[in-house]
A protein has these predicted regions:
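NUDIX/MutT-family hydrolases
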Residues: 128-160
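Acidic, metal-coordinating catalytic segment for phosphate/diphosphate chemistry
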Residues: 1-41
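A short coil-to-beta-strand element that immediately follows conserved catalytic motifs
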Residues: 14-15, 92-100
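Short, well-ordered beta-strand micro-motif
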Residues: 44, 116-120, 137-140
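Conserved Nudix-box catalytic region and its N-terminal flanking loop in Nudix hydrolases
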Residues: 45-87
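Active-site-adjacent beta-strand/loop module that shapes the phosphate/pyrophosphate-binding cleft
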Residues: 102-125
């Protein structure tokens, strides 16, 4: 997948051989692209349960995941994690720790850098974006679904083992 060099959003492939560059919906035709962008996600905990979302679109459509997404150009990963949760599930989140940084390869062979945070929310009834999330549910650690996207189960297992470490007060240092 290719991403706009201005905003980091995924762009269509275009037809470069015919002189038609990939196009960003917001910034138009792009000849200069970035190959990948870092990702940030949040293991959201409330009363011992974790909020998971079922993907409404590819890749992994219909699979459960830890909510998150791409870090936009110039955005701090902490800010991206909070923004992605609000966009996908319509809830605010307070980040409380870092579960880990994962270096993975996507199904397309692209390098991924995924920062997984731990967070809490007081919201118990998310209002998800139906374009992103088809279903949501709170799961106890012994009830995590088996049909999870990519390596999301590994991230949840790391969180459950207590690997999250605290963040500085401003979440940046």
């Amino acid at each position: 997948m290719w991403f706009c060099d201005e905003c980091g959003q995924a762009v269509g492939h275009g037809n470069v051989l015919a002189g038609e560059p990939p196009t960003c919906i917001e910034h138009g035709p792009r000849w200069r692209l970035i190959r990948n962008a870092p990702c940030a996600s949040v293991v959201i905990v409330n009363n011992g349960k974790v909020l998971l979302a079922r993907r409404a679109k590819p890749p992994f459509e219909g699979s459960w995941e830890v909510p998150g997404g791409f870090v936009e150009r110039g955005e701090h990963p902490v800010e991206a994690a909070v923004r992605e949760v609000r966009e996908e599930l319509g809830v605010g989140v307070n980040l409380t720790g870092l579960v880990g940084v994962y270096l993975e390869t996507s199904s397309l062979g692209e390098a991924l850098q995924i920062m997984v945070f731990e967070g809490t929310t007081e919201a118990t009834e998310p209002t998800p974006d139906p374009a992103e999330v088809s279903e949501w549910s709170w799961f106890a650690p012994d009830e995590f679904p088996t049909d999870m996207a990519g390596r999301h189960r590994l991230r949840l297992d790391d969180w459950h083992r207590g690997r999250a470490v605290g963040l500085p007060a401003d979440g940046r240092s």
